[in-house]
Regions:
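ATP-dependent small-molecule kinase phosphotransfer cores
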Residues: 12-81
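ATP-dependent NMP and nucleoside kinases share a basic, alpha-helical "lid"
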Residues: 71-79, 84-121
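Small-molecule kinase domains that catalyze NTP-dependent phosphoryl transfer to phosphate-bearing small molecules
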Residues: 71-72, 80, 99-100, 120-171, ...
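Conserved beta-strand scaffold positions in the cores of enzyme catalytic domains, especially
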Residues: 5-7, 104, 149
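Short, acidic/turn-prone active-site loops that include or flank metal/cofactor-
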Residues: 12-15, 109-112, 134, 156
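An amphipathic alpha-helix signature
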Residues: 2-3, 25-29, 111-119, 126, ...
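A conserved segment at the C-terminal end of the G1
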Residues: 1-12
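Residue-level signature of catalytic and energy-coupling elements of molecular machines
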Residues: 60, 86, 150
């Protein structure tokens, strides 16, 4: 949001899929009938499925990720005339969604700060967080692939200033190359 350009937020899209997509529900219910009981899909049911068997995260991902990917393609198509779009996708690299000309920005945050934010969530579950972390690439790999790094350990105002500077840098580099 701070970039003030169209933003595709994968986490928000996943939530929308759970809330709106009956086909996703039917597939999950068929594959995980012991856990998925009602539509819209409840996060508590997903958490229970992953808690009981770590392999269930792969089943869930195999159903949800293609739907989110289609939504991302639609978003990119709708915003193709925009100077810039922001893809806020935590598993961008893991799902091989980055393209050659993309400019990757690694957002670094202190572990304690991340944990503090996660604990504020309604369905906070440390076991699930550990399972999700195992599905992610190592932070060092992500940092190496990124052209820029921003520290997210500051106030919103400081972040706005940092993002403004980063935007200017990106536009300058794009216009001079």
């Amino acid at each position: 949001k701070l970039f003030k350009y169209p933003v595709f937020n994968a986490d928000q899209e996943v939530n929308n899929v759970y809330r709106e997509n009956k086909n996703c529900f039917n597939q999950l219910k068929r594959r995980l009938p012991k856990f998925i009981k009602s539509f819209p899909i409840k996060k508590s049911e997903l958490i229970e499925a992953v808690s009981s068997n770590r392999k269930n995260i792969k089943i869930i991902s195999s159903i949800v990720h293609p739907i989110v990917r289609k939504r991302m393609v639609k978003f990119l198509s709708q915003n193709r005339n925009s100077q810039m779009v922001v893809l806020d996708i935590p598993l961008l690299i893991e799902n091989k969604l980055n393209k050659k000309g993309d400019i990757l920005v690694f957002v670094r945050s202190k572990k304690a700060k991340i944990l503090k934010r996660l604990k504020k969530r309604k369905n906070y579950n440390l076991k699930i967080i550990e399972v999700l972390k195992q599905n992610q690439s190592k932070l060092l790999k992500k940092r190496k692939l990124a052209k820029y790094t921003i520290d997210n350990n500051y106030s919103a105002n400081i972040m706005k200033k940092k993002i403004k500077i980063l935007k200017e840098k990106i536009f300058y580099e794009r216009s001079s190359s």
